[in-house]
């Protein structure tokens, strides 16, 4: 069952990719969708067997590397963390496959698209189930390449080319540091197997653990789009909308958070790594929320909300609340996939326009889409008893419940980030569905709900966004739960804060995020409805324009990167090419050799004068050279006689030819 779970998406991908012309579009849909749906059902069985019944499974398939210094197995590990990650990955992936049947129905390259989707799912399964860092790295690189292929799916568009290369190169920075971290583990521990490294970690110097942990954090920063290496995430919106849902909800962006959670028995022994995670997540949360508030593209706003929620998960890791971070990851996958697929339904119905300032008044035309996006937005802003409420608020309470200065400051920073999340969620809903129509007539003339394939995934995800958090909170974060008794998540006894979070945090600080959520939602809609001129006048003032430009241009970080990093690297590369590749290498290599041989042949050619006395002089000089050689180096006289005889024969032949 477990190997079938891993292999099925790969078989679907190969069938659709290599035999797409034989099986046709419908055959590709049937094979890939049925493969992923069957894999999802097997993952649910694995969740019950491994997670609920606490029966972890390890499967050794074959030996990969068998060297004296390194032994690596094709080994797959199914524990509570693995099966918890498989649930959102495969449920969202299967629903995205179904959704794409309708969304991509007019695209001529359906087989290629579904092949990429299934391959993406397979690589994520490899990443999650691998039993050592090298196998995990195979999946890690695989999802990176698949994201490049999917973002660049419409490869005739320049924007798609640029975005995919940006995603690939930004992730290469993180991959480089992750590789260094894996080599450091190999050098320190002599192996890269999870069990061996985690069992030895308590006995190693904290500085070594810190160095390895920082490399892992930088790798996770790129993949999970934290501040500094975040620029690829909004640009990835150039891909088709189902791709955005798959990348930003369930697969690629969660890989970095998974890496840190899987490495919890390692990074728990380095307080430096934990404090870096704490502050990195806090800065990312408020940073991305501020940018998202000033974006006008519906998909980019949702992308920045993803970045903000990933910051929340990294805060949970920095607090050693790995189970809460995992719970938030699973919850977030459902309502974020719903937001993206809902946005895709809106874009699909209004002639592929993504600027939500040109929407407005779509609620009567798209009642189902409005309902599901309202549910997803309520879950995103953590309205009580929605799925997002049970994990997001608990992360904030854990930050305060740590009772350190850093934790308290992070609590207030993350609360501010949650406030801005509320504002842009209300903004998207209001400007898309509730305000007066702002778009051209054609947008509304042909606006319509999608077919069954578009609507079924929306309804299923809406149900998950309402009920999943309540139904599973005791499994993931209950005080007496035995779900993680297999030690897949390790919390050092000194870092255990769940009891303090539950019982010691004052009620005021538990209710503060909820108070801000409700009050800001109401205030933003009231301002927009009753005093729009006040907002418009402020925006057109010098101060308002400067503030809007600063945040709309994403703190000018990309401008700084281009000016001070990219330009310098390109200049250095140009100079290197000019001086080495096109300079000394070619001068000493092909061009230099050719020029030298031509000069040598011309020089030899000049010796052929056609005058007999000149040739006699050459013979005399040669004879003197060989005699002196014999004298100085003691050569055999027979050899000299042979040489002289040969010279006379050659000379005689030349004279006869003339």
UniProtKB/Swiss-Prot annotation:
Pfam families associated with the record: NADH5_C, Proton_antipo_M, Proton_antipo_N
Compartment(s) where it occurs, according to its Swiss-Prot or TrEMBL record: Mitochondrion inner membrane
Superkingdom as given in the UniProt entry: Eukaryota
Leading EC class: translocase
Primary subcellular site in the record, as a coarse category: mitochondrion
GO terms under biological process: ATP synthesis coupled electron transport; electron transport coupled proton transport
Alphabetically ordered keywords of this record: Electron transport, Membrane, Mitochondrion, Mitochondrion inner membrane, NAD, Respiratory chain, Translocase, Transmembrane, Transmembrane helix, Transport, Ubiquinone
Enzyme nomenclature, EC number: 7.1.1.2
Membrane topology term: Multi-pass membrane protein
Recorded catalytic activity of this chain's protein: a ubiquinone + NADH + 5 H(+)(in) = a ubiquinol + NAD(+) + 4 H(+)(out)
Molecular function GO terms recorded: NADH dehydrogenase (ubiquinone) activity
Residues passing through the membrane, by range: 4-23, 30-52, 81-103, 112-129, 133-155, 168-190, 200-222, 243-262, 272-294, 301-319, 329-351, 364-386, 409-431, 452-471, 505-527, 607-629, 639-656
Gene Ontology cellular-component terms listed: mitochondrial inner membrane
Function: Core subunit of the mitochondrial membrane respiratory chain NADH dehydrogenase (Complex I) that is believed to belong to the minimal assembly required for catalysis. Complex I functions in the transfer of electrons from NADH to the respiratory chain. The immediate electron acceptor for the enzyme is believed to be ubiquinone.
NCBIfam families given in the database record: NDH_I_L, PRK06590.1
Family, as annotated: Belongs to the complex I subunit 5 family.
UniProt name for this protein: NADH-ubiquinone oxidoreductase chain 5
Lineage, opening ranks: Eukaryota, Fungi, Dikarya, Ascomycota, Pezizomycotina
């Amino acid at each position: 069952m477990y190997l079938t779970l891993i292999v099925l998406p790969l078989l679907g991908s190969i069938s659709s990719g290599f035999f797409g012309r034989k099986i046709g579009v419908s055959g590709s849909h049937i094979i890939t969708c049925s493969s992923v749906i069957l894999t999802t059902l097997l993952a649910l069985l694995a969740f019950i067997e491994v997670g609920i019944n606490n029966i972890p499974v390890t499967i050794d398939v074959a030996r990969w590397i068998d060297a004296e210094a390194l032994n690596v197995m094709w080994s797959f590990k199914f524990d509570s963390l693995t099966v918890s990650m498989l649930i959102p990955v495969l449920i969202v992936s299967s629903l995205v496959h179904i959704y794409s049947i309708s969304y991509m129905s007019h695209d001529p390259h359906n087989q290629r698209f579904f092949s990429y989707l299934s391959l993406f799912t397979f690589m994520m399964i490899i990443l999650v189930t691998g039993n050592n860092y090298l196998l995990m790295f195979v999946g890690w690189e695989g999802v990176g390449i698949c994201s490049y292929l999917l973002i660049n799916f419409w490869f005739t568009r320049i924007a798609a080319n640029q975005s995919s290369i940006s995603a690939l190169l930004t992730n290469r920075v993180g991959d480089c540091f992750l590789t260094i971290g894996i080599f450091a583990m190999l050098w320190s521990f002599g192996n890269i197997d999870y069990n061996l490294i985690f069992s030895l970690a308590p006995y190693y110097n904290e500085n070594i653990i810190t160095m390895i942990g920082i490399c892992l954090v930088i790798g996770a920063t790129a993949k999970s789009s934290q501040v500094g290496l975040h620029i690829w995430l909004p640009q990835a919106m150039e891909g088709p909308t189902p791709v955005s849902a798959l990348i930003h909800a369930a697969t690629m962006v969660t890989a970095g958070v998974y890496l840190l959670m899987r490495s919890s028995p390692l990074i728990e022994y380095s307080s430096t790594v934990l404090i870096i995670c704490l502050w990195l997540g806090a800065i990312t949360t408020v940073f991305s929320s501020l940018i998202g508030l000033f974006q006008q593209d519906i998909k980019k706003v949702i992308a920045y909300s993803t970045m903000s929620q990933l910051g929340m998960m990294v805060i949970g890791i920095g607090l050693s609340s790995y189970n809460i971070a995992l719970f938030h990851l699973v919850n977030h996958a459902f309502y974020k996939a719903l937001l993206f697929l809902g946005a895709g339904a809106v874009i699909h119905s209004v002639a592929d326009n993504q600027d939500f300032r040109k929407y407005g008044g779509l609620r009567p035309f798209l009642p189902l889409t409005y309902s599901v996006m309202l549910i997803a937005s309520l879950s995103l802003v953590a309205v009580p008893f929605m799925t997002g409420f049970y994990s997001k608020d608990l992360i904030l309470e854990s930050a305060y419940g740590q009772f350190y200065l850093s934790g308290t400051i992070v609590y207030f920073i993350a609360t501010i980030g949650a406030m801005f999340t509320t504002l842009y969620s209300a903004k998207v809903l209001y400007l898309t569905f509730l305000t007066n129509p702002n778009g051209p007539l054609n947008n509304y003339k042909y606006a319509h709900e999608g077919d069954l394939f578009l609507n079924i995934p929306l309804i299923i995800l809406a149900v998950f966004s309402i009920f999943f958090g309540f139904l599973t909170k005791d499994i993931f974060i209950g005080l007496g739960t035995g779900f993680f008794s297999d030690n897949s998540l390790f919390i050092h006894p000194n870092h255990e804060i769940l009891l303090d979070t539950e019982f010691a945090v004052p009620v005021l600080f538990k209710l503060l995020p909820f108070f801000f959520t409700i009050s800001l939602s109401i205030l933003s809609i009231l301002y927009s409805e009753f005093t729009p001129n006040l907002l418009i006048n402020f925006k057109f003032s010098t101060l308002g324009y400067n503030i809007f430009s600063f945040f709309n241009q994403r703190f000018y970080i990309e401008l700084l990167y281009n000016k001070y990093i990219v330009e310098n690297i390109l200049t250095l590369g140009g100079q290197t090419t000019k001086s080495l590749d096109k300079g000394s290498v070619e001068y000493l290599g092909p061009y230099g050799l050719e020029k030298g041989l031509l000069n040598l042949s011309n020089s030899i050619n000049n010796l052929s004068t056609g005058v007999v006395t000149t040739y006699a002089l050459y013979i005399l000089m040669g004879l003197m050279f060989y005699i002196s050689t014999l004298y100085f180096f003691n050569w055999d006289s027979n050899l000299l006689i042979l040489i002289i005889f040969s010279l006379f024969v050659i000379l005689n032949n030349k004279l006869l030819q003339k």
